[in-house]
């Protein structure tokens, strides 16, 4: 019994030591674990928030980049369409107009009518002076003079038309006034282009 009593005392001493030393340590360890878990939880939450922020930022950047890319594509498309329109105008409108004007204004009969109209216009306006009539370089001066007749050629300084540097049509110079009345093929091309180009664009590109 004495031995058991001694054992009981030893156990009691051990229990007391455990409570006094181990229990606070266990409580401290538990507190450390709890704090570590809370800190880990906060770190995880912060990491999630940072990840979401990075994702949102990436999405915004991608969206902006996409919008810029789309805007660039739209602008490039507009430029391409405008270049195409200009190419079509040059090929179909201007080249066809040049070809048509060259065919019409290099005809001696047409050139003669131009010269006659210019001379009559000057006379109607009461303008006097030395008149020089030029015709296109691809037109026969002899054929034009024959078509005009002496009634008109006699009013010209050179008693007939002279060859100019332009393709077709005619010019009348009033030397004293330094005037040039110009209905050459080049002048007509510029005039018709300015007046007809808008209508041509609307007709050809109205659905573009």
From Swiss-Prot:
Q: Name one GO molecular function term.
A: proton-transporting ATP synthase activity, rotational mechanism
Keywords for this protein = ATP synthesis, Hydrogen ion transport, Ion transport, Transport
Q: Name one GO biological process term.
A: proton motive force-driven plasma membrane ATP synthesis
Q: Which domain of life is it from?
A: Bacteria
Instruction: Tell me the Pfam families matching this sequence.
Output: HrpE
Q: Name one GO cellular component term.
A: proton-transporting two-sector ATPase complex, catalytic domain
Q: Which InterPro entries match?
A: ATPase_V1_Esu, T3SS_HrpE/ATPase_suE
Q: What does this protein do?
A: Produces ATP from ADP in the presence of a proton gradient across the membrane.
Q: Which family does it belong to?
A: Belongs to the V-ATPase E subunit family.
Q: What is this protein called?
A: V-type ATP synthase subunit E
Q: Which organism is it from?
A: Chlamydia muridarum (strain MoPn / Nigg)
């Amino acid at each position: 019994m004495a031995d058991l009593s001694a054992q009981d005392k030893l156990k009691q001493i051990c229990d007391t030591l455990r409570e006094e030393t181990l229990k606070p340590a266990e409580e401290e360890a538990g507190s450390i674990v709890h704090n570590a878990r809370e800190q880990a939880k906060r770190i995880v939450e912060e990491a999630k928030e940072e990840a979401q922020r990075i994702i949102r930022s990436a999405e915004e950047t991608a969206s902006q980049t996409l919008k810029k890319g789309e805007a660039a594509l739209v602008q490039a498309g507009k430029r391409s369409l405008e270049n195409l329109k200009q190419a079509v105008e040059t090929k179909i409108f201007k080249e066809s107009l040049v070809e048509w004007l060259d065919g019409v204004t290099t005809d001696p009969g047409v050139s003669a009518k131009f010269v006659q109209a210019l001379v009559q216009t000057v006379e109607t306006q009461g303008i006097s002076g030395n008149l020089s009539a030029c015709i296109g370089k691809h037109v026969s001066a002899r054929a034009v003079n024959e078509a005009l007749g002496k009634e008109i050629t006699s009013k010209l300084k050179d008693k007939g038309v002279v060859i100019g540097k332009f393709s077709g049509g005619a010019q009348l110079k009033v030397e004293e006034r330094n005037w040039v009345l110009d209905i050459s093929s080049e002048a007509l091309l510029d005039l018709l282009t300015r007046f007809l180009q808008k209508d041509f664009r609307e007709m050809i590109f109205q659905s573009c």
